[in-house]
Amino acid sequence: MIDRYKHQQLRIGSVSPQQIINWGKKILPNGEIVGEVTKPYTFHYKTNKPEKDGLFCERISGPIKSGICACGNYRVIGDKKEDPKFCEQCGVEFVDSRIRRYQMGYIKLACPVTHVWYLKRLPSYIANLLDKPLKELEGLVYCDFSFARPIAKKPTFLRLRGSFEYEIQSRKYSIPLFFTTQGFDTFRNREIATGAGAIREQLADLDLRIIIDHSLVEWKELGEEGSTGNEWEDRKIRRRKDFLVRRMELAKHFIRTNIEPERMVLCLLPVLPPELRPIIQIDGGKPMSSDINELYRRVIYRNNTLTDLLTTSRSTPGESVMCQEKLVQEAVDTLLDNGIRGQPMRDGHNKVYKSFSDVIEGKEGRFRETLLGKRVDYSGRSVIVVGPSLSLHRCGLPREIAIELFQTFVIRGLIRQQIASNIGIAKSKIREKEPIVWEILQEVMQGHPVLLNRAPTLHRLGIQAFQPILVEGRAICLHPLVRKGFNADFDGDQMAVHVPLSLEAQAEARLLMFSHMNLLSPAMGDPISVPTQDMLIGLYVLTIGNRRGICANRYNSCNRGKYQNETKNNSKYTKAKEPYFSSAYDALGAYRQKRINLDNPLWLRWRLDQRAIASREVPIEVQYESLGTYHEIYGQYLIVRSVKKEILCIYIRTTVGHISFYREIEEAIQGFCRAYSYGT
């Protein structure tokens, strides 16, 4: 449907019986009304043509071939001069065959049937509105219980006997046995109600506004009572209050949407268009039918049997009528939601029938796969892997994906630079992967963000913008810190990439959706780009250092035997002196030359303007030199002082891993400061 703002939308809800008739009703030129499916047949086994008034009837659903009726006559579609519009012999309309994708039919049920979604799904809407236990309502729907009609003003047989007193009582084996079909109908119409018809009567008698008022009064009374001191009673009161809130919300919804509650009980059953439940031929000419066709056939068979019992057979016991009504109810339940009442129905090969609910729900259902999961132009999909060298706002796109996504822009660039004279030549250069193509692609990607999305998109961080760069391979590279926002793992997860085309979309991506601008969780406000998993392990390994401490290198009489044993057991062991470095650059150079390891302790000269060490710590050792200068050695640093006790320089005890980690943090802070000063 289309709203007043010309937006296409889909609304799912209950419809009136008149609306169901309007979906499938057609009036032929001779005045005959078609649309009702009365026969459970599909195609004739000899002619291979649809059966009249069957599930694939061409009079109801339209012609199989455009403009050709069941007789074989042909009319030009849309030609106003062609008359008549319907075939006079077979009654088939001369229209396009695509009408069989949306032209519906209907089945007129011989008895009311409850919609299993509203009865059996939790919470049960029918049970909530009627304020009755679900178990009792199920017994009433499936003809296990009956209740007296509180509408007769004069005394009746049951009211004089006091058998019911308007309460649901079991009369399954006591009432129908004494009546034939005609007598049972008269008795039931006057005295009792059972089956879905009883539910329909109760729903039709409801006043939704009175339900809201009474529920609100009861909810307030329960709230004023306070705690009873009994845990079970308090829990029972809380459950009752929650039920009253759900009941009021449900009643308000029915009022707001202008839907009558009795629509939850069906008198007419819509029949899906034939193209949505096809019968196809596989290899060898064997037909393959949709499960929904078999479920529809079961409904029609049982409904026709019940119709015969009510119209033709006057001597049939009332018990048989009730049993047949129960079979019709179960057949409709299986069609709508197979297995909701327990064991699902299976075919001859022990395969579960796929009901209407199975067709539309789930990941492979009609909505998620066909409507919500449509393929989108300028989009791609691939596995994600870690790109630790990437910036937070960048992502790596494989060349194969990038050239497809930006092919239109590359073609325009080739033509503008007069490298190609037309689109065909430009596409041939792209297929041949000439070097100029990659240069133009780099230029195009430099100013064009892309959107990355991982399903399911549960919050706004499920889709973020990135600046793409070309990478080798066939996987999308991501910075590990953006993983948590997407709720993704690098174990085979896939992500979709989209190219924003309009200027508005690109501006929104740059201003609102870039990953480095979404560092906090929109729900809690906590940081969401934090190191996790292998990043924490890497940081631990990088900064673990040598845990023996500075005293481990000291030689004294206590550990003399230890050094001797180590020398004997390991011929490669040498007691190396901890090296001194004047800058971090020299230390990293020594590591690259493999002169030191990542966790080897070393002394790094520290600039005085970077840190002022003021500590009351007592030095572990003081070493004097011949010129009068001396070294004060502490646990993690060393101070070189002059004769006048002035600080000449400071060395800190660290490792190459700590130096690398510090340099990364320092560069990140400096980059943030530059960006902040540029923004202000």
Curated annotation (Swiss-Prot):
Zn(2+) binds at C69, C71, C87, C90. The keyword Disulfide bond does not apply. Its cofactor is Mg(2+); Zn(2+). It is found in: Plastid, Chloroplast. It catalyses: RNA(n) + a ribonucleoside 5'-triphosphate = RNA(n+1) + diphosphate. Mg(2+) binds at D489, D491, D493. It comes from the Eukaryota. GO terms for biological process: DNA-templated transcription. Gene3D superfamilies: 1.10.40.90, 2.40.40.20, RNA polymerase II, clamp domain, RNA polymerase Rpb1, domain 3. Pfam families: RNA_pol_Rpb1_1 (PF04997), RNA_pol_Rpb1_2 (PF00623). GO terms for molecular function: DNA binding; DNA-directed RNA polymerase activity; magnesium ion binding; zinc ion binding. Transmembrane segments: none annotated. Its EC number is 2.7.7.6. One of its GO terms (cellular component) is DNA-directed RNA polymerase complex. Keywords: Chloroplast, DNA-directed RNA polymerase, Magnesium, Metal-binding, Nucleotidyltransferase, Plastid, Transcription, Transferase, Zinc. Binds 1 Mg(2+) ion per subunit. DNA-dependent RNA polymerase catalyzes the transcription of DNA into RNA using the four ribonucleoside triphosphates as substrates. Belongs to the RNA polymerase beta' chain family. RpoC1 subfamily. In plastids the minimal PEP RNA polymerase catalytic core is composed of four subunits: alpha, beta, beta', and beta''. When a (nuclear-encoded) sigma factor is associated with the core the holoenzyme is formed, which can initiate transcription. This is DNA-directed RNA polymerase subunit beta'. It comes from Ceratophyllum demersum.
